Amino acid sequence: MEQMNRHDGMPTAAKRKRIPYGLMNFMTLRERNCYYVDKTRFIESIEEANMCFFFIRPRRFGKSLTISMLQNYYDINKKEQFDKLFDGLYIGENPTPERNSYLVLPLNFATVDAGLDNYRAGLDNCVNIGILNFCDRYKQYLPDDIIVRMKEECQGCVDQLKFLAAECEKVNQHIYLFIDEYDHFTNKILAEPKHMVRYREQTHGEGYLRMFFDAVKDATSSSLTRVFVTGVSPVTMDDLTSGFNIGTNYSLSYEFNELVGFTEEEVRTLLTDYAAVCPFNHTVEELICNMKPWFDNYCFSVEEYGKTTMYNSVMVLNFLDRYIRSGYQIPKSMIETNIRIDYDKIRMLIRHDKNFDHDASIIQELVTKGYVMGNLVENFPAERINDPDNFLSLLFYFGLVTIDGSYRGYSRFIIPNEVVRDQIYTYLLDTYKENDLTFEEFDKDKLASKMAYEGDFKPYFTYIADSLKKFSSQRDRQKGEAYVHGFTLAMTSQCKFYRPISELDNEGGYADIFLSPLCDIYEDMTDSYIVELKYCKSNTSDAQVQKLFKEAAAQVSRYADSDLVKESVKTTRLHQLVVIYRGVDMVVCEELKYECPDVCGAAGGA
């Protein structure tokens, strides 16, 4: 049995490596004996790729750590530390000819002030600091007076980059430029439509950002030998690439599908390694079963569909860290606040989605049907974000949908996992709260608890019905069934006791909503639910509603007999419910019995 120590009141194994949650510095990771999932095998492929490498992935997916790893590998100053940094890793045994041969210039545009009114000053400051640090780090390779002359001759970052490239060429040194979060300021633009004109000024013609990337392009003809650029959106790339037209976007390449994030094999190895030195209360397989629905299922290449899906690495490390620090208990919440996608970005997406002229809400369709069909666009300009395929592609790049196959020439996209589903539903609900209307969270939680532990479901679904009617607009009512279904799903997704599964595909057919109980987290909960949700127009008669109830009752009985449902409910008591809306009024909310209920409520407008 492993020797155990106590640290901050929590048991930790003496031999276990540190969990690198939130760590973006590769050298620090290696020096502090942190666990590292080896991605160095991709260095060979990156070297064989175009000299200017563009790579787009969702935020908090491990991009910055990968960039840091590459910087340490290519840095000429780290030559003597190569064995220390890369011993035991793939590239340590298989080094490439270009290792430790570059002067590395790292720039992180996340530090640039996103305000367009002073964007030039922010970009100048970011690049100036980067170049000054560069000159200090590599002073033994550069002319002695390079900083003095640069200050005398250069007015901004465009001039500085040109000057630096020319000086390095004189002394026969090669630069590897890394730009992390190149599109950081674009998020502000997309969230605020009023800034679109200024955005175009920066990225087109004589715009300053455009001029900077033109300078990067020019420098590649001298000492700037390699460029590696990352971000989360292809929008700015499209607006810049007509000037910077030597870069290649490898974001959708099957060769780099696994460059960031974890494969299931990597997650399994990670858990196995920690289980060997920590007193886990669960098997590796049990932990995988808990993690997979929440963190897995990203696919970034059409060619890789059905072969390899990716886990969000930050989510996995956060889960493992909380699991160990809680005494090896499954965390009560599978979602950590730092993982949530930027609030303004989601609101922007929903706003654009609601403003489609054709009134075909992609997000509404995604929530209601569970999938959408479309074409994945590699890059597109900001002014064309409302084109359906462009908008869908933006959802993909942000990590809100993922590839799930193809059909009749179109790609099929789904929500990848429960963490993303929670975010979409949460912010979708926020769009119904824009008129100073708020949910009574405390009351809602109490109702959810009674449903999970006492089988008292009617107050909870009545609460949803009241909220639905309260927040519905005339446009929402026109959407009818899609609105009712989407709103109900969004509300049930906020219930901490269940994982709502929409349109459950099994041998019995399709169930509208299965509230799968999170028994691994709430071991004492007693009740689970499968809900057949029906909708009819506001002028539907009571007799027609009762006929609809009989149809729903037959359907929900078949769903309840499926193996998937039986396995998921575990020791809970499964309630088979029928909920019927007439317009925006809930007129039936009954547990399945053998006689039709009385139809309640009056017909509402819809």
Give the location of each predicted region.
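Domain-level recognition of nuclease-like catalytic cores that cleave nucleotide substrates
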Residues: 564-606
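Walker A/P-loop-proximal flanking segment of P-loop NTPase domains
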Residues: 3-78, 83-92
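Conserved P-loop NTPase "ATPase switch" module shared by AAA+ and STAND
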Residues: 171-202
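Structural recognition of the conserved hydrophobic beta-strand(s) that form the central parallel beta-sheet
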Residues: 176-180, 210-211, 225-232
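Substrate-engagement module of ASCE P-loop NTPases
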Residues: 163-171, 198-225
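Amphipathic alpha-helical segments of the small helical/lid subdomains adjacent to P-loop NTPase cores
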Residues: 236-243, 250-321
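Extended alpha-helical interface modules used as scaffolds for assembling large macromolecular complexes
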Residues: 247, 306, 311-554, 558-560, ...
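P-loop NTPase motor core
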Residues: 22, 38, 75-136
